[in-house]
Regions:
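C-terminal membrane-cytosol helix-exit motif in multi-pass small-molecule transporters
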Residues: 1-19, 225-230
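Juxtamembrane intracellular "pre-TM" segments in multi-pass secondary transporters
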Residues: 12-45, 69
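Intrinsic disorder in cytosolic terminal tails and internal cytosolic loops
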Residues: 14-28, 105, 229-241
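Extracytoplasmic gate region of multi-pass secondary transporters
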Residues: 38-96, 148-157, 184-193
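A membrane-interface helix-boundary motif in multi-pass transporters
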Residues: 73-76, 110-113, 196-219
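Loop-to-transmembrane helix entry/capping segments in MFS-fold secondary transporters
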Residues: 74-78, 166-176, 205-208
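Helix-to-loop junctions at the C-terminal end of transmembrane segments
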Residues: 92-108, 196-197
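C-terminal transmembrane helical hairpin of 12-TM major facilitator-type secondary transporters
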Residues: 108-156
Length: 241
């Protein structure tokens, strides 16, 4: 796909859609310094990483959860969860993008208010998914949670692009992805695995419910970072135009 895009799509002039003329390319160190000078970039970086810690942890362990708690085979769990995650994940991202496109021009704080709302509203649904005994109700709760969990990506990535200058947008996204993968993908599944081992002696096979609950609710901690970033995001976005 990368080769196809490279050979068929013309590279647009950087900054041609910005209000100000494109600035000359800055050194990576200078570009990073300029990014972190905007406090909302720092907060969205770690808010998004904590949000991802929750999502990655649940995604990795959800199949084991379905096997242990609901007695499904790994094949059945893969079909059910895989299809639901694909369909409703796409819906969540599209819906998140649609909402933030309409709200952020009125107030840039919606770039961070929206993922905050998604995290807070999604929290009770992940608890319902983990603790409901009826499979149909548990899966319905998962669908609602997953639409909200996937949807946070749209406002977060949109904000990162809005904060970065035309010559440093790739660096801004790369730094975000590095942080998200370092914290979210490295720590999220490991945290659930560690808690599984610790809680299994007390709760048996049901211990996975509690370990996934801890990881699932870390996205609420991300709200603290999002709301802190919302205090300066309007000024930071305006200074990037």
């Amino acid at each position: 796909l990368a080769l196809l895009v490279r050979s068929t799509v013309r590279e647009p002039l950087r900054g041609c859609m910005d209000a100000a003329p494109p600035a000359p390319m800055a050194a990576s160190r200078e570009a990073l310094r300029a990014l972190f000078a905007k406090r909302s970039y720092f907060y969205v970086l770690f808010g998004g990483a904590l949000h991802a810690l929750s999502v990655y942890g649940l995604v990795i362990w959800i199949y084991v959860f379905m096997e242990r708690v609901h007695g499904m085979s790994m094949k059945e769990a893969s079909v059910y969860i895989g299809l639901l995650s694909l369909l409703f994940g796409l819906l969540g991202v599209a819906l998140g993008g649609w909402i933030v496109d309409r709200l952020s021009p009125k107030d840039a704080r919606w770039f961070l208010w929206l993922p905050s709302l998604q995290a807070v509203i999604g929290a009770p649904f992940i608890l319902l998914f983990l603790y409901l005994e009826r499979l149909d109700l548990a899966l319905a709760s998962y669908v609602i949670y997953w639409v909200l969990a996937a949807g946070y990506n749209a406002p977060v990535y949109a904000l990162i692009q809005s904060l970065a200058g035309a010559s440093s947008r790739a660096l801004a996204v790369a730094t975000y992805l590095f942080t998200v993968n370092l914290i979210g993908l490295a720590i999220g599944p490991l945290l659930i695995g560690f808690l599984n081992d610790e809680l299994r002696s007390v709760f048996g096979e049901q211990g996975i419910r509690y370990s996934m609950m801890v990881a699932g609710l870390t996205n609420v901690v991300a709200v603290i970072f999002y709301m802190a970033g919302a205090r300066t995001v309007r000024r930071d976005v305006a200074s990037s135009c």
